[in-house]
C-alpha cells in the first residue's frame, strides 16, 4: 500500500522572525493586541485546567501558550534556568514547583479566543479550583498516565459536577516509566463514573512514545521539528490497525448510548461519517453525558495541538451554557432568570466577582461578564451592598501581566481595580432589577495554628498581611482566642498555613512563628432538647423582657457542618421585628460550645413560641434570651464532639504494604480499598485528621523514603469516646476547671 504522507506546518515557523523581535522585549510576551480583539460568541471558550497535584497542568498550559504564539519561549515548572512557568508568577510557586493561586490568561487558536485559568492541584488550595470552575464553561481534566485517578482528581470531579462544567480528559505523561493510559480510562469509568472512551490512542508509551492515533479522523499524528511544532499526518501504523478499529467501535458504542441521533444510526446499522461523530461528541460533551479522552505528553511536546482543536470542537461557547440569576425582593418568592449571553449589549451588564487579589495598584477583582457590555467610565452597583463603583480601568490578565482594554462583553473574563467587594458578589449596571447570581461554595477550615510575629516592631505589617490574605482567601480565617491569649489562623491544611506564613515574610518583611497544628473540632447535639427561657431585668427606667420557647435538635449527618434557624412562631407572642435578635443570639452562642470551646454545628434552632412586654421588650432582650436558652440546652442536652475525617491515599512499593496498612490502622484509619500494579500498591483509607499529624515522617521511615501520600477533607464524624474525653479534659485544664458535669454521648 502506498503511504500518503503530508506535513502540516503550523503558523508557528512563519512567526520565527517575529518571535526573535518579541524575545528582545523586556517583558518577553507577545503583543496582546490581536488576542484582545472581540470575537463573536461562537469563537470564545472559557476553560480551566484542573487535576491532582503533579499531573502536569502548568506544563500543559505553558505549551498551549507557546503553540498559540502567546509566549516566545517555554520554561519548565522546575527548569534548570530557574525562570519557572509563565503561569506560576509568584516567587514561592517557582521555588516550590507547585501552583498556589489560580492564574488567568487568554490566547488565540484558529481564530478562537480561549480564556484559560490554570488552577492548583494541592488539596489545601481547593478554593482556587472552586471559584475558577464557578465561572468557566468547560474544563480540561488532566490525569497522570502513571498515577491515574487520585484523591484530588475526585475532588475536582465533584466540583465540576457541582457547577455542571463539561470536560475533556487529557491523559498526560505518556513518556513516564510505568505509564498505562488504558488503566487510567478504566479508573475514570469506575471511580469517577464517567461514560468515557478514547478519541485518541498513543503510538507507544514510555521511551517509545512516538505520536498519537486520531480515532475520529482515522489517522496517525507525529510531532516533529523544534518543540514538536510540525504535525505530520500519516496512515495508522500496521500493528495498531486492529486495536484502532476496536477502540473506534467502542467509542461509537459509548457515544450511541449517550446521543439519540447517533444511537439511531447505530441501531439502523447505517455508516457513520466523521462529521456525525464530531457532532455527537460535541452534543454529549456539553450535556456531560460523555467524556472524550485524549492522550499526550506535554513535557515532550506531543498531543497539545490536537487538544487545542478538541477544546474548540467539543467544549461549549458561552452561548451554549445556561447561566442563571435570581430576583430577590422582600416578601416575595425568589425568581429564576436566564441571563442573555449575546454580545450585543442590549441587556444590563451582569458580572460575578470570583477572586480578589492585592495588586500593585490596589485591590484587583477578577470578574466574569455573564450579560451585556461594560465600558470604561460606566457605573456599576454591587447587588449585595448597593454601592456604586465608577470603572476607571478595565484589564485582561496574562498571568501577572495586566493588559488594558476599553470594553468587555458577555463571556469575557477581566479584572477591575479598587472595587470594595467580597468573593462571590454580583455586579450590575441596573440595581433596580434586584438580580444576583449564586455565590461560590466555600469549604470550612479544618486546621488551626497559633501565629505571632517574631519581632514586635512588625505588628503593623503583620496586621496588613492578615487583612489582605483573609480578604483574598475565604478559607483562610484569623481570630484572637481570649482564653489562651493567642492569635490563631485556620485553613485547609498545614501547607496552606505554611505558605501564608512564608508569604508574610517575603511580601511584608514580617517573619512569623507558627504553633503546632490544632484540629477544628465541632460540638453537636445527640438528640432534641426543649427550652423555655425567660429573660427579665428591671433596674430603673425601661427594663428588659423576653421569653422564648422552642426546641434545639441535631441535623442529619450529611448536614452536620451547618447551623439552621427556623421561625415557627404564629401570632404576635414573639413580634416579628424581634425574631432577628433571637437568631443573632443563637449564632453568637454557637461560636463556642461548653464541652470543648469549639463551634457548634449540625444543630437546628426552632423558635416555636414566647412572650413579650409592650414596653420592656426589645431586639437586645430577645438576643439575651437566646443566650440564656442555649446555656440551658448546654446543661440539659446530650452533646458530642465531631472531628474532620480525611480521605487518605498512600502509594508505595508493594513490599511495604503490610507496614503501611498497619500504621493507618493504628491511627484509627478505615481501609476503603487497595490497588496494585507493577510492584507498587495504592491504599485508600478514611482517617481522623487528629491522627494524621506526623504521618509524613513515619511513612518516609517505614518505606525507605519511597512512599508518598495525599489527603483531603471528607466530612465531620463523631470522634471516639476516648478522644472526646481527652479533648474535653484539655479544654477544662486550659480554663482552670475540673471535669464538666455535663451529659455526653452515651455509648
From Swiss-Prot:
Location(s), subcellular: Mitochondrion
UniProt cross-references to Pfam families, sorted A to Z: EFG_C, EFG_III, EFG_IV, GTP_EFTU, GTP_EFTU_D2
Annotated ranges, domain tr-type G: 42-319
Amino acids binding GTP: 51-58, 118-122, 172-175
GO (cellular component) term, any one: mitochondrion
Transit peptide residues according to the UniProt entry: 1-32
Biochemical pathway: Protein biosynthesis; polypeptide chain elongation
An example molecular function term from Gene Ontology annotations: translation elongation factor activity
HAMAP family: EF_G_EF_2_B (MF_00054_B)
Function text: Mitochondrial GTPase that catalyzes the GTP-dependent ribosomal translocation step during translation elongation. During this step, the ribosome changes from the pre-translocational (PRE) to the post-translocational (POST) state as the newly formed A-site-bound peptidyl-tRNA and P-site-bound deacylated tRNA move to the P and E sites, respectively. Catalyzes the coordinated movement of the two tRNA molecules, the mRNA and conformational changes in the ribosome.
Protein family membership: Belongs to the TRAFAC class translation factor GTPase superfamily. Classic translation factor GTPase family. EF-G/EF-2 subfamily.
Name of this chain's protein: Elongation factor G, mitochondrial
Organism phylogeny: Eukaryota, Metazoa, Ecdysozoa, Arthropoda, Hexapoda
Amino acid at each position: 500500500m502506498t503511504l500518503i504522507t503530508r506535513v502540516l506546518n503550523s503558523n508557528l515557523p512563519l512567526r520565527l522572525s517575529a518571535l526573535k523581535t518579541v524575545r528582545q522585549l523586556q517583558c518577553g510576551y507577545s503583543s496582546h493586541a490581536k488576542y484582545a480583539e472581540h470575537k463573536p460568541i461562537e469563537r470564545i471558550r472559557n476553560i480551566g485546567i484542573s487535576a491532582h497535584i503533579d499531573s502536569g497542568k502548568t506544563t500543559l498550559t505553558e505549551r498551549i501558550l507557546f503553540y498559540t504564539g502567546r509566549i516566545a519561549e517555554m520554561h519548565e515548572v522546575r527548569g534548570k534556568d530557574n525562570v519557572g512557568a509563565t503561569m506560576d508568577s509568584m516567587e514561592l510557586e517557582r521555588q516550590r514547583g507547585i501552583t498556589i493561586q489560580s492564574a488567568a490568561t487568554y490566547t488565540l487558536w484558529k481564530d478562537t479566543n480561549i480564556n484559560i485559568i490554570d488552577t492548583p492541584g494541592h488539596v489545601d488550595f481547593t478554593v482556587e479550583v472552586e471559584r475558577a470552575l464557578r465561572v468557566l464553561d468547560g474544563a480540561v481534566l488532566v490525569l497522570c498516565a502513571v498515577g491515574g485517578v487520585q484523591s484530588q482528581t475526585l475532588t475536582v470531579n465533584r466540583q465540576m459536577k457541582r457547577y455542571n462544567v463539561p470536560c475533556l480528559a487529557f491523559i498526560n505523561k505518556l513518556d513516564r516509566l510505568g505509564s498505562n493510559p488504558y488503566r487510567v480510562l478504566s479508573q475514570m469509568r469506575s471511580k469517577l463514573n464517567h461514560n468515557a472512551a478514547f478519541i485518541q490512542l498513543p503510538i507507544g508509551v514510555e521511551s517509545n512514545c512516538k505520536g498519537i492515533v486520531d480515532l475520529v479522523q482515522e489517522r496517525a499524528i507525529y510531532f516533529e521539528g523544534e518543540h514538536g511544532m510540525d504535525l505530520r499526518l500519516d496512515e495508522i501504523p500496521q500493528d495498531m490497525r486492529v486495536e484502532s478499529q476496536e477502540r473506534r467501535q467502542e467509542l461509537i458504542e459509548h457515544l450511541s448510548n449517550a446521543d439519540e441521533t447517533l444511537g439511531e444510526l447505530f441501531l439502523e446499522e447505517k455508516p457513520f461519517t466523521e462529521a456525525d461523530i464530531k457532532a455527537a461528541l460535541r452534543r454529549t460533551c456539553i450535556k456531560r453525558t460523555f467524556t472524550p479522552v485524549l492522550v499526550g505528553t506535554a513535557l515532550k511536546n506531543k498531543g497539545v495541538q490536537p487538544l487545542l482543536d478538541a477544546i474548540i470542537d467539543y467544549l461549549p461557547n458561552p452561548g451554549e451554557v445556561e447561566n442563571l440569576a435570581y430576583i430577590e425582593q422582600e416578601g416575595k418568592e425568589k425568581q429564576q432568570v436566564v441571563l442573555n449571553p449575546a454580545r450585543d449589549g442590549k441587556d444590563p451588564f451582569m458580572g460575578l466577582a470570583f477572586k480578589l487579589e492585592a495588586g500593585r495598584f490596589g485591590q484587583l477583582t477578577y470578574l466574569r461578564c455573564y450579560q451585556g457590555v461594560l465600558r470604561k467610565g460606566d457605573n456599576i452597583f454591587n447587588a449585595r451592598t448597593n454601592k456604586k463603583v465608577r470603572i476607571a480601568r478595565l484589564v485582561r490578565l496574562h498571568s501577572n501581566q495586566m493588559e488594558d482594554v476599553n470594553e468587555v462583553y458577555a463571556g469575557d473574563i477581566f479584572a477591575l481595580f479598587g472595587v470594595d467587594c467580597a468573593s462571590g458578589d454580583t455586579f450590575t449596571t441596573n440595581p433596580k432589577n434586584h438580580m444576583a447570581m449564586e455565590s461560590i461554595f466555600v469549604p470550612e477550615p479544618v486546621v488551626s495554628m497559633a501565629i505571632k510575629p517574631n519581632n514586635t516592631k512588625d505588628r503593623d505589617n503583620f496586621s496588613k498581611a492578615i487583612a489582605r490574605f483573609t480578604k483574598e482567601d475565604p478559607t483562610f480565617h484569623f481570630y484572637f482566642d481570649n482564653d489562651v491569649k493567642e492569635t490563631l489562623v485556620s485553613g485547609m491544611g498545614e501547607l496552606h498555613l505554611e505558605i501564608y506564613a512564608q508569604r508574610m515574610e517575603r511580601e511584608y518583611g514580617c517573619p512569623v512563628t507558627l504553633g503546632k497544628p490544632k484540629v477544628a473540632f465541632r460540638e453537636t447535639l445527640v438528640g432534641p432538647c426543649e427550652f423555655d427561657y425567660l429573660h427579665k431585668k428591671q433596674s430603673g427606667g425601661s427594663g428588659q423582657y423576653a421569653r422564648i420557647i422552642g426546641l434545639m435538635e441535631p441535623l442529619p449527618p450529611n448536614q452536620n457542618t451547618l447551623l439552621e434557624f427556623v421561625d415557627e412562631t404564629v401570632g404576635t407572642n414573639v413580634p416579628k421585628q424581634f425574631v432577628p435578635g433571637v437568631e443573632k443570639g443563637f449564632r453568637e452562642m454557637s461560636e463556642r460550645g461548653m464541652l470543648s470551646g469549639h463551634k457548634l454545628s449540625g444543630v437546628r434552632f426552632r423558635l416555636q413560641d414566647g412572650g413579650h412586654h409592650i414596653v420592656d421588650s426589645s431586639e437586645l432582650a430577645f438576643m439575651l434570651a437566646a443566650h440564656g436558652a442555649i446555656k440551658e440546652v448546654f446543661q440539659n442536652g446530650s452533646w458530642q464532639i465531631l472531628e474532620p475525617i480525611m480521605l487518605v491515599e498512600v502509594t508505595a512499593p508493594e513490599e511495604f504494604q503490610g507496614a503501611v496498612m498497619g500504621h493507618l490502622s493504628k491511627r484509627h484509619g478505615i481501609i476503603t480499598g487497595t490497588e496494585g500494579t507493577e510492584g507498587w500498591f495504592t491504599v485508600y483509607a478514611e482517617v481522623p485528621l487528629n491522627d494524621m499529624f506526623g504521618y509524613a515522617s513515619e511513612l518516609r521511615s517505614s518505606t525507605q523514603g519511597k512512599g508518598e501520600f495525599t489527603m483531603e477533607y471528607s466530612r465531620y464524624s463523631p470522634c471516639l469516646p476516648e478522644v472526646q474525653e481527652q479533648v474535653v479534659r484539655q479544654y477544662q485544664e486550659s480554663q482552670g476547671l475540673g471535669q464538666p458535669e455535663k451529659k455526653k454521648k452515651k455509648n
